[in-house]
Every structure is written in structure tokens, then in C-alpha cells.
């Protein structure tokens, strides 16, 4: 969803949110989140979250509060050959969902990844307080890690190694800020 009548795309959704019924406002919030992601604007993404947000996905596990925003800051800062599309944005007064596909160059191997993700949200006070992304980690590891991911990506050993590496990268990013 574009907001051509606004010079700054980030100003439109928050203004509109205050005038819409909650389910519509939550659809706008989800749209704002992914539009910011398309622009690699992690600050606008993090602004959609409550301070105590709970985020989870198969790569990072569960992140809380600032760690969730910092994950997006790290990923958007490091993004190479990145594109994102999203659709199926739905919500009611308390929950929402969306589907998104990110295509990017995985820097550790130079492989292109097309990650197909389902997202679920819980809202509180007009912001996202829970965000749970779901994707096939084996499919991701086959693309990102090549043969190693194809042969071993389904094993707990590789799954745990992916999570440990993701968290190590996040901690290093946070230490360098």
C-alpha cells in the first residue's frame, strides 16, 4: 500500500491508524511495518513494536524488547540484493497475520535466498506486542548453506548452529552500536 499524498511514507500510517476501526488500523500497521522493511527502514519497523515486544522465528528463536528491533536493524544494515513482497494482510481487534517473501544474498555463502514466511501478530495499544514468523528452516538452509544445508539442514545440530550463529551476529551488532 502506497501513500502518494504524503512526502514521507512513514507519516501516513500512524495518522490514518488513529481514524480507523481497530481491525483496519491493524492492517495499516502491518502494512506500515512491511513497507518500512521494503525501504530497509528498521527504525520505522521498530516503532511499530511495543517496548516489550516478543518476536520469534526459526532462525533467532525468541527475542524480547530491544533485541527484536536490533535484529531488524542488523538485518536491514547488512541486506544485499534485497527485495520484499507482502500480501494477505488480515487482522481483527487483537490479532493479525500476513504473508511475505524476502529475497536476498546470504552474505556468509553468497547464495541467493528466497524465504517464504507466514507472520502472526498480537496487538496492544495500537502497536505490535507479539510477532511470530514461521518458515521452513530446512528449505532456508538448503538455499543459504548449499550442500551442507541440503544434507544436514533438517537436523537439530544444524538448526541449533544456525540459531547460535544468528544470536552471535546479533550480539556482535549490538556491541558495535
Regions inferred by a protein language model and the residue ranges of each:
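Short, low-complexity N-terminal intrinsically disordered segments enriched in polar/charged residues
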Residues: 11-47, 164-177
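Hydrophobic alpha-helical core bundles mediating ligand binding, dimerization, or RNAP-core interactions
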Residues: 30-37, 49, 68, 72, ...
